[in-house]
Amino acid sequence: MNIFIRVLLVSSFLFSVNSKIDQLQEESKFQEALKLCEDNYNDNDVDLLWRLARAYFDIADQTSNIDIKKNNIDKALPYSKRALEIDPNSAKANHWYAVIIGQKGLLEGTKQKILNSYDVREYGLKAIKLDPKYDGTHHLMGRWHYNVADLAWYERTIASAIYATPPEGTFEEAIEYFGNAIDTNPNDLRHYLWMAKSLYKISEYEKAKSILDEASKIEVKNESDKILINQIKELYSKL
């Protein structure tokens, strides 16, 4: 068989597999998406590797159980690292490495959260530069600014001890990023919740209410959305 035809057939097959994985993910069939990733595993396929990291993240995101979250994020990390090694200029590889390393920091406590924060910012900003229209990375950077702005005094003391120049973030910048995420994808509950949380932090209560009212019109698709709806109701009760 002509080598060009062989390469074309392989590329067509991989595109078909990746499209099916994306479809399963869109339908919230995360375990099926994970299985399809594992069944077609290739240590040199950047697009499969970041999808594998995403699948583990999605499973972690469906629960409030910390042990289950940690287990799946730990599984996701080496795949996100490998994807970045293969193609440092892949927007999705940069995005998912930033997401996973950020989640790992949040789950492991204050010091690790601060240590990982610089990587989250570095790879998150690079992902936006490579693909400015992906809502997920705008959300990621919104969360980064929110988390840094929301550091308690003792966490800031730890940050100052670790770094000569601790990370700096503001709720206003978080709001801007969440706004970008909503503009790009107005159907994701996460963007509205975290924009409202940021508005709440700067006492913009009426604007926060308005954002949560918009969120209430969005279809709930999976367990993660159900968790978000409960958080939205809790925040609304404070306004």
Feature annotation, model-predicted:
Residues 45-47, 90, 134, 188, ...:
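Residue-level recognition of tetratricopeptide repeat
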